[in-house]
């Protein structure tokens, strides 16, 4: 059961964002025959892994024109044979993927990168594939902001130090695994991804451990930065809140003081008026008494 010859003899380059419908239809028919023949279960990883094994050694990974085709096929398989992803509609374009279609893009990204790793292509093809994948998967802007720096950092760093023989360079393979897992999976999910990739690519334990160490350190630095920024925001919000509360308390104190002053002024005015009236009455009495006493004197 061979792949259609059209895929191996294609002369025109296939862009990273669009795959001609004729290629899609032929490839999906071929994949359907494989999956039907092997009675695949509707499980994302099992279905994709099965086709990975079938594709291994069949496609020419030295041909950059086939990279997006293979990557798109892997994503299409994962969507096609998983019930939760049945909303994927038009198979002619991979770029029509929308928010909410994939519930675990990190897993799909890992599976697709596994295809490139198994194929053994290197260097610029890997980076081009990452560019294409990042442009195709439905990541939010916030997720892209997190994913881009780590992916390019690890892949380019490992590519710079690669050995001539790709298969003797586990660092590059580990880098792609790390980049694929950086999507933001929790620790349990991330460990599962690494375990699957370990069995698929035979990354050495030392390389995997080193990769996890670097990944954890980088992630911790990012977490620390995010935490520091969050603390600064919270401190600024607390200062603003305290300032507002202080102003409110001062305003309430001023209002209470004004009320007290008004009461005091009223009481003082009453006291002064009463005192003045009392003094006038006493003066008149004294004059009367004097007038009475004077004749006797």
Curated annotation (Swiss-Prot):
One BP term from GO: symbiont-mediated perturbation of host cell cycle progression
Coiled-coil regions listed: 222-270
Localisation per UniProt entry: Host nucleus
Keywords tagged on the record: Activator, Coiled coil, Cyclin, Host nucleus, Host-virus interaction, Modulation of host cell cycle by viral cyclin-like protein, Modulation of host cell cycle by virus, Oncogene, Repressor
Entry keyword Repressor: yes
GO cellular component: host cell nucleus
UniProt domain Cyclin N-terminal: residue ranges: 21-113
Location of the region described as Transcription activation domain in the Swiss-Prot/TrEMBL record: 21-113
Keyword Coiled coil: yes
InterPro entries: Cyclin-like_sf, Cyclin_epsilonretrovir
Similarity comment text for this entry: Belongs to the cyclin family.
Quaternary structure note: Interacts (via transcription activation domain) with host TAF9 in vitro. Interacts with host CDK3 and CDK8.
Comment block on domains: Contains two known functional domains, a cyclin box motif and a carboxy terminal transcription activation domain.
Protein task: Transforming protein which induces the development of dermal sarcomas. Induces positive and negative regulation of transcription from host and viral promoters by interacting with various cellular factors involved in protein transcription regulation.
Protein name, as recorded: Retroviral cyclin
Gene source species: Walleye dermal sarcoma virus (WDSV)
Gene name as annotated: orfA
């Amino acid at each position: 059961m061979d792949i259609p010859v059209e895929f191996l003899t294609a002369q025109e380059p296939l862009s990273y964002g669009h795959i001609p419908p004729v290629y899609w239809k032929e490839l999906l028919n071929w994949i359907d025959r494989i999956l039907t023949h092997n009675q695949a279960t509707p499980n994302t990883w099992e279905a994709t892994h099965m086709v990975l094994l079938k594709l291994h050694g069949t496609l020419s990974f030295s041909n950059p024109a086939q990279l997006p085709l293979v990557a798109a096929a892997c994503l299409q398989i994962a969507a096609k044979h998983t019930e939760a992803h049945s909303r994927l509609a038009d198979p002619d374009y991979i770029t029509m993927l929308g928010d909410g279609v994939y519930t675990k893009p990190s897993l799909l990204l890992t599976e697709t990168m596994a295809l490139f790793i198994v194929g053994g292509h290197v260097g610029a093809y890997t980076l081009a594939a990452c560019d294409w994948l990042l442009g195709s998967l439905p990541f939010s802007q916030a997720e892209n902001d997190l994913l881009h720096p780590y992916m390019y950092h690890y892949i380019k760093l490992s590519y710079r130090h690669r050995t001539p023989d790709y298969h003797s360079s586990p660092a590059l393979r580990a880098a792609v695994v790390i980049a694929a897992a950086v999507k933001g999976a929790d620790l349990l999910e991330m460990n599962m991804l690494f375990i699957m990739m370990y069995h698929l690519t035979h990354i050495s334990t030392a390389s995997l451990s080193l990769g996890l160490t670097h990944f954890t350190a980088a992630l911790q630095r990012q977490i620390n930065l995010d935490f520091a920024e969050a603390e600064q925001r919270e401190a600024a919000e607390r200062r603003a809140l305290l300032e507002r509360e202080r102003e409110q308390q001062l305003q309430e104190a001023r209002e209470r003081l004004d009320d007290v002053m008004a009461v005091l002024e009223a009481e003082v005015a009453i006291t002064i008026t009463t005192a003045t009236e009392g003094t006038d009455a006493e003066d008149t009495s004294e004059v009367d008494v004097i007038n009475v006493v004077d004749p006797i004197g």
